[in-house]
C-alpha cells in the first residue's frame, strides 16, 4: 500500500512539472512573437541635411525681403538670407518601405497605412495628395522626396546666413512670362531698381562660389 502511494505521488509530481514546462513554453512563444512583430516595423529617416555646412560652394534655395541686400561697414555688399531644404530619403530605404512602417519627416512621424507604387516610380503614401496623404517621387540622383501639386517640393526653413555678394553678381528674373528674362546687377538692389521682393524657396536660388554669391535666379511658378 505504501509503495502504491509513493508511486502515485511521483506520477503527480512529474505531471505537474510537465504542465509548468508547457506554460513556460507558451509564455516564451508569446513574448517572442510580440518581439518579432515589433521588429518588423521599421522607421525610415530622411538623409542627413548638410546644407548649412556647405555655404561656401553651393546652390541654395532662399528667401529675402527688401533691405536684406546692403553694403556693410567695410564697403562690401552682403545679403541676409533665409535658407530652405526638404526631406530626402535613400532609395534603398524607400524600396523596402511597407505598410505599418513609420516615415519620419521634419514635422513628425507618419504611419504608413496604405502604400501604392506606380509604374513611373511615384509612391502614394496613405492615398497620396488626393486623399490627404502625400506623394514620394525620385530624381536623377536616386533620392526620394515629398512632392506637391505642380511638382512643388515641401520646403522648410533650416537657418539664416549672411553671404557676401560678388562684384560680378547677376540676377536673372524669369518669373514673369510676359516680360521674359530681365537681368539685374548688384547696384540695382541698392538703388531700388528691384521692386518685386517675392523671393521664395519655390522660385529663387542662388549660386555661391568661394563664399560669394555670383548668380541669383528667380523662375516662374504656376
Question: What do these predicted ranges mean?
Answer:
Residues 19-21:
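Bacterial signal peptide processing site
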Residues 31-222:
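Solvent-exposed hydroxyl-ligand-binding patches built from regularly spaced Ser/Thr
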